[in-house]
Amino acid sequence: MNNRVFDKTIKSLSAAMQMRQHRQNVISANVANAETPNYRAKKMDFEGALKRAIDLEDLGRMHVSHGDHFVMGQGAIGRVRPDIYDNPEINYTNDGNTVDLEKEMAALNENSIIYNAATKLINKKLAALKYVASNGGR
């Protein structure tokens, strides 16, 4: 995707879709462990990292707090890695588990909706490029 045809929008949408896949895995793990004693629900912060990567893409260099947060090289947008951590917003149950199944299912639904929206946007962008490529010389 280093070609100029694939602009910042496509790179950003692609990275957002990858983030949604990561988030799906995190939420699925939380749901799967809803009955596991002492399991701590995980949370993922990707939006902040994605925003920083998009902002820094044009600067040509990146400042990071930890070397593993970004992979340097062919552009920052598509190579951002999300931070996954124990969710501090959840209360413990009697067995020490912190999964709130209702919140996790709502997050799963929200994640699915946003993933589908990103998919539609990238498909429209690619359809426009296909149209221009096939009808540009007419």
Report residues per predicted region.
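Amphipathic alpha-helical polymerization modules
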Residues: M1-R138
